[in-house]
Amino acid sequence: MEARRSVDLSFQIVDRIHEILLAKGLKQKDLASMLGKSEAEISRWMRGTHNFTIDTLISIEHALGSPILKVVGKEETMPV
Protein backbone atom coordinates (compact mmCIF):
# COMPACT_ATOMS: atom_id res chain seq x y z
CA MET A 1 0.00 0.00 0.00
CA GLU A 2 2.86 2.41 0.78
CA ALA A 3 4.44 1.79 -2.63
CA ARG A 4 1.14 2.66 -4.31
CA ARG A 5 0.87 5.87 -2.25
CA SER A 6 4.44 6.79 -3.19
CA VAL A 7 3.73 6.33 -6.90
CA ASP A 8 0.48 8.34 -6.62
CA LEU A 9 2.30 11.21 -4.90
CA SER A 10 5.09 11.15 -7.50
CA PHE A 11 2.54 11.49 -10.29
CA GLN A 12 0.81 14.34 -8.44
CA ILE A 13 4.16 16.15 -8.15
CA VAL A 14 4.87 15.63 -11.85
CA ASP A 15 1.37 16.84 -12.76
CA ARG A 16 1.92 19.99 -10.67
CA ILE A 17 5.28 20.67 -12.33
CA HIS A 18 3.70 20.20 -15.78
CA GLU A 19 0.88 22.57 -14.77
CA ILE A 20 3.37 25.27 -13.73
CA LEU A 21 5.48 24.81 -16.87
CA LEU A 22 2.38 25.12 -19.06
CA ALA A 23 1.12 28.21 -17.22
CA LYS A 24 4.51 29.90 -17.66
CA GLY A 25 4.95 28.83 -21.28
CA LEU A 26 8.01 26.76 -20.42
CA LYS A 27 9.21 23.35 -21.53
CA GLN A 28 11.14 20.63 -19.75
CA LYS A 29 14.33 21.81 -21.48
CA ASP A 30 13.81 25.26 -19.91
CA LEU A 31 13.52 23.66 -16.48
CA ALA A 32 16.67 21.65 -17.16
CA SER A 33 18.53 24.84 -18.03
CA MET A 34 17.25 26.64 -14.92
CA LEU A 35 18.37 23.77 -12.70
CA GLY A 36 21.68 23.10 -14.46
CA LYS A 37 20.53 19.56 -15.32
CA SER A 38 20.42 17.66 -18.58
CA GLU A 39 17.18 17.40 -20.52
CA ALA A 40 17.45 13.61 -20.19
CA GLU A 41 17.55 13.83 -16.39
CA ILE A 42 14.48 16.09 -16.26
CA SER A 43 12.72 13.72 -18.66
CA ARG A 44 13.42 10.81 -16.29
CA TRP A 45 12.05 12.86 -13.38
CA MET A 46 8.90 13.69 -15.29
CA ARG A 47 8.00 10.05 -15.97
CA GLY A 48 6.48 9.92 -12.50
CA THR A 49 8.71 7.25 -11.00
CA HIS A 50 11.47 9.54 -9.68
CA ASN A 51 11.84 9.69 -5.91
CA PHE A 52 12.02 13.47 -5.45
CA THR A 53 14.04 14.70 -2.48
CA ILE A 54 12.92 17.73 -0.50
CA ASP A 55 16.02 19.57 -1.74
CA THR A 56 15.12 18.81 -5.36
CA LEU A 57 11.55 20.00 -4.86
CA ILE A 58 12.78 23.22 -3.23
CA SER A 59 15.14 23.80 -6.18
CA ILE A 60 12.30 23.27 -8.65
CA GLU A 61 9.98 25.58 -6.70
CA HIS A 62 12.68 28.26 -6.60
CA ALA A 63 13.45 27.92 -10.32
CA LEU A 64 9.77 28.09 -11.31
CA GLY A 65 8.77 30.66 -8.70
CA SER A 66 5.73 28.58 -7.75
CA PRO A 67 4.91 26.16 -4.93
CA ILE A 68 4.69 22.47 -5.72
CA LEU A 69 3.74 20.99 -2.36
CA LYS A 70 1.25 21.93 0.32
CA VAL A 71 2.18 20.81 3.80
CA VAL A 72 -0.77 19.46 5.76
CA GLY A 73 -1.37 21.15 9.10
CA LYS A 74 -1.88 19.32 12.39
CA GLU A 75 -5.64 19.73 12.29
CA GLU A 76 -5.87 18.06 8.89
CA THR A 77 -5.75 14.30 8.73
CA MET A 78 -4.22 12.04 6.13
CA PRO A 79 -6.48 9.38 4.59
CA VAL A 80 -5.43 5.87 5.53
Pin down the residues of each PLM region.
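N-terminal flexible/basic segments that precede or flank functional cores
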Residues: 1-19, 24
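Residues that mark the N-terminal boundary/hinge immediately upstream of a DNA-recognition element
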Residues: 16, 27, 38, 53-56
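The alpha-helix within a helix-turn-helix
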Residues: 21, 32, 61
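DNA major-groove recognition helix of helix-turn-helix/homeodomain DNA-binding modules
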Residues: 55-70
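Short, charged recognition helix plus adjacent turn
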Residues: 72-80
